[in-house]
Each structure stands twice: as structure tokens, then as C-alpha cells.
Amino acid sequence: MLKYLSVILICFAITERSEAQKADAFTWWNPAGSAFPVIEGQAWPKEVKSPYDRLPARAEQTVRKDVWDLSRHSAGLYIKFRSNADEIRVRYGVTSKGNFGMPHMPATGVSGLDLYAVNHGGEWVWAPGLYHFSDTITYRYANIEVDRQFKGKDGEFRLFLPLYNAVSWMEIGVPAGKTFTPMPLSDEKPVVIYGTSIAQGGCASRPGMAWTAILERQLNCPLINLGFSGNGRLEKPLIDLMTEIDARIYVLDCLPNLVGTPDKGLENKIWESVKGLQAKRPSTPVLLVEHSLGAGSGIINAKRVEDCERSSKVLRQVFADLKKEGIKNIYLLSNAALGMDINSTVDGSHPTDLGMKQHADAYTKIIRQILH
């Protein structure tokens, strides 16, 4: 028995040493240590308290604590780089250790990564990864071939970061001798989205399946994700921060967190938010979004449907009143256009991957119409 255990321990030690040697054969890069900003999706890259935050450090004094804490989550952030590597590894830590997933959302979405690339035909391709969740989370993307016709050539990659966890540190590795070139931030104007848990990414199976990430790829332009789970409430400190961003369009998708607000209070919030944005950025379009659920969604919870319909009705009325007052450059995305049905959510609120794609397609269609 003792001999048997000794053999097992020796084999284990050899395996551990072999894995360590493989890791040593990789060249590792720390995005936070880059000579220039490389974390896309941040509106204030030089003002953040921690490298993977979404709001500037000064916002801690102006937004509610719940909003600030959620802003530490890396939802919507991604890193662009070029490489000819046939294997890419990522190792990183998150602040909520041991709490990697949620009952209605897998660890791969809450705390995981997602790697996409653009082939030489301009099409998006995706790399499945092997992952392990512990104090140090690891992802291994093997046998990468972005384009068979250009084997061994550099590919352009986008690594999407966790939706519902805060990244404390990260390193990206490629085999020694392979090329790896971080890409600078885009200088294009971003789409800026202020929303709820749905915008933050709940409950996508992986970060790249959040509707905001799908939208970013479909529009092929930068996107700032200001989605805060349970806390997308059209609050002035967030509206003021949004006006600091020279956006191509502002999106206000907060009704799911405002269904309990009395009609008059909801009217005021919508009205003041639109006026606040247009006072500072009069030429930037503002897209108002109805509640994603309604009578056509097939949900058989009468109270929930009634609340959703009521909030959307208030939004439609405010939209009409704003138009009557001569406010221009405002648009409305309807519940019907979002097209949610009985297959679209995990729990009657948060989208499945199918629901995320439905959201992204509806947004893509209307934003293209507005901007072109």
C-alpha cells in the first residue's frame, strides 16, 4: 500500500513539474502594466482606482455604494491584441474568490473569459477554452487556427472579461517565440449604455454572449457598458458621468429596475435624464428603451406583465411629450422590437443566450437606422 502511494505521489510530482515547465515556456504579459491603455470599454482609463474598474475613482464620492461596488465588475471590458500563437493561456484572479457563479448564471459567465478573433475575411470566429476555477483562474485556448488560408499569420483577438466579478490581476501568455502585440484603444466614438443587470450581462453563459458584447461585435465599434445589477435607476450622478463621454449614441435601458417607481416619479426620472444628456450633448442621439417584457412575451405571471407594461406606457408618454416640446434626436426601442418570448429568459427577467441575441439584433437594427 505504501509503495502504491509513493508511486502516485511521484507521478503527481512529475505531472506538476511538467505543467510548470510548460508554463515557463510561455511569454507572459500583464495588461495593467502596459505602457499605454489597452483595456477597451473604459471611458476613463487614466482615472480608474483599479485597472479593471468601469468608473473613475472620483465617482466613489458621488454614486451610491451599491453602484460603486458593481462598477468594479469588469462587464463590457475587453482586451485587443494580435498574435500568431496556436495556443493562448490566461491566468488571473477575481475579488469574489470561491463565489464564481450564481444559481441562475454559470461561473463561465460570472467570472469567466471569452476569446474571439477576426479572420482575414472580416468574420468573427470563436475559441473554446479549457478552464479551471480556483484562487488563480486559468483558461487555455489550444489548436488555434484563425484562418486556414493564412496559417501562421497574425490574427486579431478580443478577450472579453468577467461580467459579474472584479478582476484583481491578469496575465496573458503565448508560447515563447510566437508574436504578441497589444492593440491600443479605439479612437472612435463609443456607444454608451446605461442599464440594469440585463445590460451588465445577466444571465449570459459567457462574457461574449452578453447582448452588449454581441452588439459591439455587430456594430464593430467601441461600447461603454454602464449596466449595474439592480441599480440601473436613471440617477443624476450617472447621467452627469455619461455627459463626460463623447458618445455616438446614449442608450437608457433602466425600466427593469424602475417598475416599482410611481408613474409621476418615473416620468420625472426619464424627463430629467434626457434633458440632462441633451443639455451637455445636444447633438448626440438618445435611445429610450421599453421594458423588455410585456404582454407578447408569453409570461404567465399577470402581475409581472402588468408592471412591465405600465412602466413602458409611462416611457412612451414621456417620449411623446418630449417630441411635442420640440426635443429632437431622441428615439424609442419598443418591447415588440426586442421580441422576447417564452424561450428568452432564465427566470422571467434575465435573458438566456437566445434572449441576449434577440436584444443585440434589435439594438443593432435601430442603432444602424439612427446613425446612418
Map each language-model feature to its residues.
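Sec-dependent N-terminal signal peptides
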Residues: 4-13
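N-terminal secretory targeting modules
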Residues: 13-190, 368-372
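Serine-esterase "nucleophile elbow" of acetyl-processing enzymes
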Residues: 104-107, 147-151, 157-232, 236-246
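Oxyanion-hole/transition-state-stabilizing segment in secreted/luminal serine hydrolases
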Residues: 203, 215, 232-280, 291-298
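The substrate-binding groove and active-site-proximal loops of carbohydrate-active enzymes
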Residues: 255-266, 301-309, 347-354
